[in-house]
From Swiss-Prot:
Keyword Cell inner membrane: no
Domain spans labelled VHS: 12-141
Biased composition (Acidic residues): 284-293
Record Pfam families: GAT, VHS
Keyword annotations: Cytoplasm, Membrane, Phosphoprotein, Protein transport, Transport
Record-given protein name: TOM1-like protein 4
Gene3D superfamilies linked to this entry: 1.20.58.160, 1.25.40.90
MF (Gene Ontology): phosphatidylinositol binding; ubiquitin binding
Organism from which the protein derives: Arabidopsis thaliana
């Protein structure tokens, strides 16, 4: 035990240290306070280290001596005087040592003599050493505020008990009671409701004073809950504290998420549905509809010329007796066509636009025209009955001749029609040939 403090002083002034090792210095103070008899050996080691030629060892010895004077009391003050450390320090300053060593010695001497009351104080030896250097014309560094409270009395057992008691009271103050847990739950509910009503398009609303205060309260409650969980032995209080901690974490996490989303271009309610893409699509739909309508109109306008019958085509039907050409009304052009009476409401000889009629009237009119046409010569009996029926009902074909005489295959180039007399002559010749061939067949069979 007698060598513990001395060995600690050796380690505190080891030249391998970069700077003062405060853990070793405090350990040295504890050893001397537990056994004041070891102070003598420790001061002896420090005196030896102070006379070293290595400035690093000297500065380490001065720091260790300063630590002992602040923490070990009257025994060390007297040992510094008795061991002649004050005279050694004055000699070192007069020899002009390293600047840091010189400044440290001057600061210690000035602080000590001021703390002990100067010339008329308890230890006038400190003042004498100070005055000796001052008389030699050596300027002392200016005093600092830390030098005024240089000495601190050694800590005693009652003080330690008081510190422990204060620490326990602080822990009790930071814990939570059942009433405070209920109050914290109310704060959590209010903050959750306010975050639920938060407008994502207005991130500044999170900076409202009420929300800021509630968030701060919740964070304070969270710290106190952690202290409660780690210290309490009440199971009911522990369960409620854990439940409160979960709610606090949930609401604070939601607040942080909203704050993070608001700080970045967010996809909040207003920013998540920007209209530009939809507006562009709608405009494109309108343009497509308009273009489709225009295309349909152009298609209808161009469909009539492309469907015009070519000369010599079989699209029309010719009445052999009258020589007139009949066309189905669906394929006929609106120009130059005179409709049979009664005229339809959409017929106009001067209109250049296409006429769109319903399919059912066109089909009925076309079928009516087809029924008025005679059968082909190959069907002789039906053709003869058709002519007899027509002569008996109308007496002549003059009405159809008058109605269809001016019909043409195309509106631009009227077709050259054959004379009715020629057509009638051809039809009669063909009819006579048919009768003669049938008569010959009958004679052969007889």
């Amino acid at each position: 035990m007698a060598n513990d403090a001395a060995a600690c002083a050796e380690r505190a002034t080891n030249d391998m240290l970069i700077g003062p090792d405060w853990a070793i210095n405090i350990e040295l103070c504890d050893l001397i306070n537990m056994d004041p008899s070891q102070a003598k050996e420790a001061v002896k080691v420090l005196k030896k280290r102070l006379g070293s030629k290595n400035s690093k060892v000297q500065i380490l010895a001065l720091y260790a001596l300063e630590t002992l004077s602040k923490n070990c009391g009257e025994n060390v003050y007297q040992l510094i005087i008795d061991r002649g450390l004050l005279n050694d320090m004055v000699k070192i300053v007069k020899k002009k040592p390293e600047l840091n060593v010189r400044e440290k010695i001057l600061t210690l001497l000035d602080t000590w003599q001021e703390a002990f009351g100067g010339r008329g104080g308890r230890y006038p030896q400190y003042y004498n050493a100070y005055n000796d250097l001052r008389s030699a014309g050596i300027e002392f560094p200016p005093r600092t505020e830390s030098s005024l409270s240089f000495f601190t009395p050694p800590q005693t057992q009652p003080d330690e008990d008081a510190a422990i008691q204060a620490s326990l009271q602080g822990d009790d103050a930071s814990s939570l009671s059942l009433e405070e847990i209920q109050s914290a739950e109310g704060s959590v509910d209010v903050l959750m409701d306010m975050l639920g009503a938060h407008d994502p398009g207005n991130p500044e609303s999170l900076k409202e004073e009420v929300i800021v205060d509630l968030v701060e309260q919740c964070r304070t409650y969270q710290r106190r809950v952690m202290t409660l969980v780690n210290t309490t032995t009440d199971e009911e209080l522990l369960c409620q504290g854990l439940a409160l901690n979960d709610n606090l974490q949930h609401v604070l996490q939601r607040h942080d998420d909203i704050a993070n989303v608001g700080s970045v271009p967010s996809n909040g309610r207003n920013t998540r549905a920007p209209p530009p893409v939809q507006i562009v699509d709608i405009n494109h739909d309108d343009e497509d509809d308009e273009s489709d309508d225009e295309f349909a109109r152009l298609a209808h306008r161009s469909s009539t010329p492309t469907r015009r019958p070519v000369h010599g085509s079989d699209s029309g039907m010719v009445d052999i007796l009258s020589g007139d050409v009949y066309k189905p009304q669906g394929n006929s052009s609106s120009q130059g066509v005179k409709k049979p009476p009664p005229p339809p409401p959409h017929t106009s000889s001067s209109s250049s636009s296409p006429v769109f009629d319903d399919a059912s009237p066109q089909q009925s009119k076309s079928s009516e025209v087809i029924r008025n046409l005679p059968p082909p010569p190959s069907r002789h009996n039906q053709r003869q009955q058709f002519f007899e029926h027509h002569h008996s009902s109308s007496g002549s074909d003059s009405s159809y001749e008058g109605q269809t005489r001016n019909l043409s295959l195309t509106s631009s180039e009227p077709q050259k029609e054959e004379k009715p007399e020629d057509l009638l002559f051809k039809d009669l010749v063909e009819f006579a040939k048919t009768r003669s061939s049938k008569a010959n067949n009958n004679n052969r069979s007889l």
